[in-house]
């Protein structure tokens, strides 16, 4: 655990704005969240989707910042993160940037919420984007499930309503609609109806200064009087069924009249419901043949009400009756255990998870906790509060059949099942990865390659390990061979990622540095058996969004186009980054794999040609990933391409999403894929064909010369040089770049790249643009459309 929890402070500004501040010196980025106490349920019934539509419009210009100088272009230009989310009763806006840019981002965020332009032409363009999202939403299996479960709620309750917007529910030319839109913004986007959360490495005094200066922008005035929602009564167990694929089961409990402290208690409930250990609910459901995987969600939470949903990937014997019988048997056993026993280990797990959250997830989680429990503590404590202890039995008392609604789809009409196997209830065992590692002397030799380029810190170290074959590569085993270790690693603040089926054999550990060596040691033990006896590849669960499906398989498709020749293997390569000395000493005590250590791969073969890979999908929409490899791996080339990609982000997004409304999922980034680095562009569209999407992308690239060269290079150069320095805010990206270069050349020196970045000029940038847009420039397309003429497959 950290020697001291982060410093935090809460205050109220004169205009009524609630503020929460959190300072952690090891946070590489600073982040901000503004939560508004209004969402889709507060929108006028005559205009479903108005709240979500307004969320989109905020990004299209404000009183002091035109759209071209708003929050989104700033974040894109500075390599940060940004998003917004309209929920049932809240709307969130959040971003992360380097600490020195937090003030600039916060000024733009609060200005756009307080004084949006809401220009008519921008409204028309953005409504089409919203309509595209609506089409995708209306066709999804998740929507069918949500609408079916809503039928079990009281008709007068807003959670039972239809709140998605489209071009027909948003009549832009109607004066009444425009009046409602402006009134919604004025009525709800007030300081007293908002929460501002800031987190970063800056001193609390600096965070408070920013909050007071920029928070004063929001208008004062009383918060809108919240209308109490109708009760969520116990109406008896009921099920909706559908024959449509995919196979799914969902259970939803309607919780009502919950006391203060319930949401803190719910954190413990979530951990117990999802605990992947013998005797836990997921293990019990699998043993009974009822569920392969379990996911928990809160579709609705407000004050003393909530909808708790368990989403289930059905097991081989799954039925509604079998699932509910196994669930309620497990819950009955849970109720018999004293709360003090259930709490054991929970605080340690929760505190470790919070201690390793990046800045952006941290402000989001803190904002959620403080919004639901206004009087609660900001940081997890060693035990539940008195209010949470009192709320615990009342929370469990509502997890009963009388409050359950279920949805079943894609299951056989008749299924013969054996009696469910009783699984004894069990509590989570102690997690060995949460234990304080023993002190070790500094080793005389270090068998693992360690880079000192990234500044060491406890909060985030990284370790990469890869096995490689010079000839055909056997399929990587499914992550299931690792047993409980991915879950235990997550509890200890370590994100464990293993190769997806069909991809190269690579292990990545990222997170709490003192726990990395022990996690590596236990994972290696599990993987060694798979190396000795490779297994048939498993089928990965599908991603819910088409573009994410393509991104998931991209890492295995690109290397297949340029395989390295030879035979032999496996051999291993590894690299640790950002570890303090104590973690380095612990790492030295971990025995490396018994296989030989691999030599550097050398420079990759030159990539050429236009390659199209068809990824079959049942989705009616079309999605395209376009990868444009840079011509070589020289530092000067890489530096120019990285700057070029950064300059292209804003014009690509503006042209494809805003002006042409080509799709609602549009992104571009510099990516390292296999042996190649370059520009990756992704678009998903509900109406355009893959070839039309590609043509629009190429046209935008061809027209981008002026936009690429429009800005002075000074700020961009400095930002990129900082990104590849020891104190970078992009720790994972720098570590990945070190790992990429180390595999190729064995070198751990980024000085040549930093020097090339510092020396960039317009001539180098123009040369990179010419390489990208040349008629014979190599291309790789991954799409759910057939290979067109003229492309290699």
How would you describe each model-predicted region?
Residues 1-28, 426-460:
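N- or domain-start disorder-to-order transition segments that initiate the globular core
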Residues 2, 160, 190-191, 195-250, ...:
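An aromatic/glycine/proline-enriched structural segment found at the starts
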Residues 16, 23-74, 133, 251, ...:
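Active/ligand-binding-proximal structured segments within catalytic/core domains
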Residues 36, 63, 67-184, 292-296, ...:
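Acidic/histidine-enriched segments that form metal/cofactor-coordinating
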Residues 121, 125, 174, 198, ...:
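Non-catalytic accessory/assembly modules
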Residues 248-252, 274-314, 486-499, 625, ...:
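A structural supersecondary motif
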Residues 345-456, 560-590, 717, 722-793:
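C-terminal regions of mature proteins
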């Amino acid at each position: 655990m950290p020697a001291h929890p982060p410093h935090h402070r809460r205050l109220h500004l004169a205009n009524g704005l609630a503020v929460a501040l959190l300072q952690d010196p090891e946070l590489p980025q600073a982040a901000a969240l503004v939560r508004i106490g209004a969402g889709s349920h507060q929108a006028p019934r005559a205009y479903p989707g108005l709240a979500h539509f307004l969320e989109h419009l905020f990004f299209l210009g404000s009183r002091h910042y035109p759209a071209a100088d708003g929050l989104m272009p700033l974040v894109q230009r500075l390599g940060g993160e940004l998003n917004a989310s309209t929920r049932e009763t809240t709307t969130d806006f959040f971003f992360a940037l380097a600490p020195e840019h937090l003030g600039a981002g916060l000024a733009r965020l609060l200005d756009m919420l307080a004084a949006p332009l809401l220009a008519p032409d921008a409204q028309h363009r953005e409504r089409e984007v919203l309509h595209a999202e609506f089409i995708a939403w209306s066709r999804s299996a998740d929507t069918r499930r949500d609408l079916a479960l809503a039928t079990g709620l009281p008709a007068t309750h807003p959670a039972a309503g239809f709140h998605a917007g489209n071009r027909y529910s948003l009549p832009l030319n109607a004066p009444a609609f425009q009046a409602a839109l402006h009134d919604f913004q004025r009525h709800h986007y007030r300081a007293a109806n908002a929460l501002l959360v800031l987190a970063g490495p800056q001193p609390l005094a600096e965070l408070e200064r920013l909050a007071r200066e920029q928070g004063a922008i929001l208008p004062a005035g009383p918060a809108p009087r919240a209308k109490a929602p109708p009760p969520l009564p116990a109406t008896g167990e009921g099920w909706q069924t559908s024959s449509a694929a995919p196979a799914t089961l969902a259970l939803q409990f309607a919780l009502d009249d919950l006391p203060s402290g319930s949401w803190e208690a719910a954190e413990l409930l979530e951990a117990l419901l999802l605990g992947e250990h013998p005797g836990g609910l997921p293990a019990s459901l699998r043993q009974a043949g009822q569920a392969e995987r379990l996911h928990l969600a809160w579709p609705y939470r407000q004050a003393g009400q909530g909808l708790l949903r368990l989403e289930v990937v059905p097991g081989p014997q799954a039925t509604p009756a079998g699932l509910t019988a196994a669930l309620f048997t497990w819950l009955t056993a849970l109720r018999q255990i004293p709360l003090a026993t259930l709490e054991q280990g929970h605080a340690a797990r929760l505190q470790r998870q919070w201690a390793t959250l990046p800045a952006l997830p941290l402000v989001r989680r803190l904002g959620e906790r403080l919004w639901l429990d206004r009087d609660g503590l900001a940081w997890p404590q060693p035990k539940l509060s008195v209010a949470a202890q009192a709320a615990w039995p009342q929370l469990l008392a509502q997890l009963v059949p009388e409050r359950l609604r279920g949805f079943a789809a894609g299951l056989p009409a008749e299924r013969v099942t054996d009696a469910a196997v009783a699984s004894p209830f069990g509590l989570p065992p102690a997690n060995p990865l949460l234990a304080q590692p023993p002190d070790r002397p500094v080793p005389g030799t270090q068998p693992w390659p360690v880079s000192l380029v990234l500044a060491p810190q406890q909060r985030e170290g990284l370790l990469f390990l890869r096995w490689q074959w010079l000839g055909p590569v056997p399929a990587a085993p499914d992550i299931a061979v690792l047993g409980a270790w991915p879950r235990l690693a997550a509890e200890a603040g370590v994100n464990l990622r293993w190769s997806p089926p069909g991809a190269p054999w690579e292990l990545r550990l990222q997170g709490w540095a003192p726990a990395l060596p022990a996690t590596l040691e236990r994972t290696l033990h599990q993987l060694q058996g798979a190396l000795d006896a490779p297994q048939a590849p498993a089928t990965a669960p599908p991603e819910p969004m088409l573009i994410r499906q393509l991104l998931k398989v991209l890492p295995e498709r690109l290397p297949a186009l340029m395989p390295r020749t030879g035979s032999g293997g496996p051999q291993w390569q590894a690299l640790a980054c950002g570890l303090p000395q104590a973690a380095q000493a612990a790492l030295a005590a971990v025995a490396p794999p018994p296989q030989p250590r691999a030599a550097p791969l050398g420079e990759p073969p030159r990539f050429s040609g236009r390659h199209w890979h068809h990824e079959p999908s049942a989705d009616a929409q079309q999605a395209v990933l376009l990868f444009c490899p840079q011509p070589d791996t020289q530092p000067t080339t890489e530096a120019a391409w990285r700057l070029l990609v950064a300059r292209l982000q804003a014009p690509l997004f503006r042209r494809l999403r805003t002006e042409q409304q080509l799709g609602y999922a549009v992104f571009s980034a510099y990516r390292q894929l296999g042996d190649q680095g370059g520009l990756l562009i992704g678009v998903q569209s509900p109406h355009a064909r893959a070839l039309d999407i590609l043509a629009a992308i190429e046209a935008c690239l061809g027209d981008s010369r002026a936009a690429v060269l429009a800005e002075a290079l000074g700020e961009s150069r400095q930002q990129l040089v900082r990104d590849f320095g020891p104190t970078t805010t992009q720790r994972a990206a720098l570590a990945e770049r070190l790992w990429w270069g180390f595999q190729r050349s064995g070198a751990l020196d980024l000085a040549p790249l930093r020097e090339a970045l510092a020396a960039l000029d317009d001539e180098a940038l123009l040369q990179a643009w010419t390489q990208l847009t040349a008629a014979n420039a190599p291309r790789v397309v991954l799409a759910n459309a057939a290979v067109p003429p003229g492309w290699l497959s």
